[in-house]
């Protein structure tokens, strides 16, 4: 098979003379048409520091493609800054952007018959959006993560974006003066790169490396470091070789490799969003995968990394301690990874890890050996019960109060809940319910970092529960339960909770329960009426109409299911 087996459809033959004329206008020569056309999906943007450092990575990839005797074709992809839109109506567009990014890449690459695609992204939804596109198309591809941000510093402490959100709660409670508050705001993010803890972007990049769709060590590099530029160039070179070997995403993205990715997510204490996104990626790759698979893996994989938001360290610390290859080697030796999975380099996981030390380096406590794991089981649990028969997601490790039964404080939007928190109307023992924020009801399934961080800042993070049919940021921690499905907008049980009802969150029993009788539940369901959609035009209306349930990834193309 030729290197240009796709692009030749628009470059070869008499009938394609007009097509070639367009290429000549771009500086192509006749000889170039024999070489593969490689798309570079460039997420560079000055909207957010997560993406502001991507252009030099794209430039390095473009040059490496040329040196590899291939033709780079650059196109842009949009981004939304989760950190900037958080707590506002703009956050409704965040999950929507995952679908838009996937559609943009698929549209450009398929419309132009590209032979391979290098996807370069930074902020949270860039990650799954790009991988979903590669999995859908099954055109040779590689993911280049833009890199993490370095931590900020103030008064001897490392800072991240979550430090600022939590400072809001402390400031409103009078526990922090204005000088410290402003200093944290101004020092938390010192430069370009994605948010520095094991939040969503770093979680997904680590998982992509574990799955074999990104190069070893690439997921924990800092954006501002030169090694990140070199890694982008090497990624492009490897992708051109994959095109020539016809190594495709679905050769790599298999049930076994997704199990590897999820094992690493559990071992590193990754984001709840990974559950939603890997359901979507598996759907795109046509890999059988469901929400219960996460629970199966959680029960056998320990947490061995002490990373923010609930731990001490950030991604750059993990990188210095050996990065994802070190984590994977520990898991592989423990029989917790599939070593025979193929990776984008053509090597298996076991071959890739052959020269990685068996034990983490001494003198550090970022990565722990299995026998000294922080927690014996993973942290991302799937809870079920009469409030979430399809399942929901919670981080359950390290909780001081793993069981809470308390009165429901019910809010039909994040905004109303945030007002109550800021007005100090939430008390110890309450269970905050934020509903009509699901994929269809929001629409867009907003992240609840603002209210959860405000609760933490007010000293309520360990004593107040919070459940929602929306999502959580990767920076969220505490007794919080998200992705409750079915969602309120379609009549899920969360829609039937009333102010003051007794609600139980039980991390031990993996239970989310509304403590009323079945008869009362049935009566409330009969009386419930679906509200009108909040949007009837535009992209939010389209997403609300098309998105499936969170328990299947909230994708917009699940038509056959």
Swiss-Prot record:
E.C. no: 4.2.1.9
Enzyme class at the top of the EC tree: lyase
Catalytically driven reaction(s): (2R)-2,3-dihydroxy-3-methylbutanoate = 3-methyl-2-oxobutanoate + H2O; (2R,3R)-2,3-dihydroxy-3-methylpentanoate = (S)-3-methyl-2-oxopentanoate + H2O
Record: residues binding Mg(2+): 82, 124-125, 447
N6-carboxylysine modification, residue list: 125
Keywords, sorted A to Z: 2Fe-2S, Amino-acid biosynthesis, Branched-chain amino acid biosynthesis, Iron, Iron-sulfur, Lyase, Magnesium, Metal-binding
Cited PROSITE patterns: ILVD_EDD_1, ILVD_EDD_2
GO molecular function: 2 iron, 2 sulfur cluster binding; dihydroxy-acid dehydratase activity; magnesium ion binding
Cofactor binding description: Binds 1 [2Fe-2S] cluster per subunit. This cluster acts as a Lewis acid cofactor.
Binding site for [2Fe-2S] cluster: 50, 123, 195
Active site, renumbered: 473 (proton acceptor)
Any GO BP annotation: isoleucine biosynthetic process
Pathway annotation from the record: Amino-acid biosynthesis; L-isoleucine biosynthesis; L-isoleucine from 2-oxobutanoate: step 3/4; Amino-acid biosynthesis; L-valine biosynthesis; L-valine from pyruvate: step 3/4
SUPFAM superfamilies: IlvD/EDD N-terminal domain-like, LeuD/IlvD-like
Cofactor(s) it depends on: [2Fe-2S] cluster; Mg(2+)
Family affiliation: Belongs to the IlvD/Edd family.
Self-association state and partner proteins as the record states: Homodimer.
Function: Functions in the biosynthesis of branched-chain amino acids. Catalyzes the dehydration of (2R,3R)-2,3-dihydroxy-3-methylpentanoate (2,3-dihydroxy-3-methylvalerate) into 2-oxo-3-methylpentanoate (2-oxo-3-methylvalerate) and of (2R)-2,3-dihydroxy-3-methylbutanoate (2,3-dihydroxyisovalerate) into 2-oxo-3-methylbutanoate (2-oxoisovalerate), the penultimate precursor to L-isoleucine and L-valine, respectively.
NCBIfam families: ilvD, PRK00911.1
UniProt-recorded name of the protein: Dihydroxy-acid dehydratase 3
Organism: Bordetella bronchiseptica (strain ATCC BAA-588 / NCTC 13252 / RB50)
